[in-house]
Amino acid sequence: MKLEKHMIDTVKEWHLKIGYQKENIRLYYPTESVKDFLDVKNSEKLSTEELCDKVQSYLSEKMIGMGTVNVSQEENRFCIEISKELNEYIAKHIEPSEFLQEFLKALSSGNIEIVRHLFRSYAQQKQGHCIEEPHEGEAGIAFSFQEERIDPYVYCVEQGDFGLTYHRFVKTEYEKLF
């Protein structure tokens, strides 16, 4: 997955969950995640400043005509600040994921079986396969699709005192954690 796709997907997720606000948005990424997104090998000995410049240059090129981003780095994470113009561009010109919309609706039911049914039926509808992995503890059940064309993320859904909660991971990050 590319960094710009993850950024846009995250902003669209926020728009669906809390609504669009014409303001700057800050996204935080661990340094290792940024390296993965940009295919920077550990053997490449980039200083923090060089990596920060590389991210800034990469995103400036990818976001031409949409708005600006500013990249900073502190300790082991990067802050990517999306300008209100880019946020507005994403809100007006990029459609939200159909699956994510359906997922959030299923999640609001508070019923894990409705979420499970969504993943299974969506996979079947798109001629794909649903993957379901139960985890002990706070990860709950991890749902994903074998085919990334359907949706490239892993959704860890957990039943708690206040209903269903979830965390969405890029598959490579999920594999590192579990």
Predicted regions and their residues:
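Positively charged, polyanion-binding regions of nucleic-acid-associated proteins
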Residues: 1-27, 37
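Charge-rich, solvent-exposed alpha-helical interaction surfaces
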Residues: 6, 10, 37, 54, ...
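Short glycine-rich, basic-tinged beta-strand/loop micro-motifs
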Residues: 21-41, 101-106
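Charge-enriched amphipathic alpha-helical scaffolds
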Residues: 25, 35-68
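Charged low-complexity interaction tracts in eukaryotic proteins
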Residues: 58-96
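Negatively charged, low-complexity tracts enriched in Asp/Glu with abundant Ser/Thr
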Residues: 97-135
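Short, hydrophobic/aromatic-rich segments at coil-to-beta transitions
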Residues: 137-143
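Intrinsically disordered, low-complexity regulatory segments enriched in Ser/Thr/Pro
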Residues: 148-178
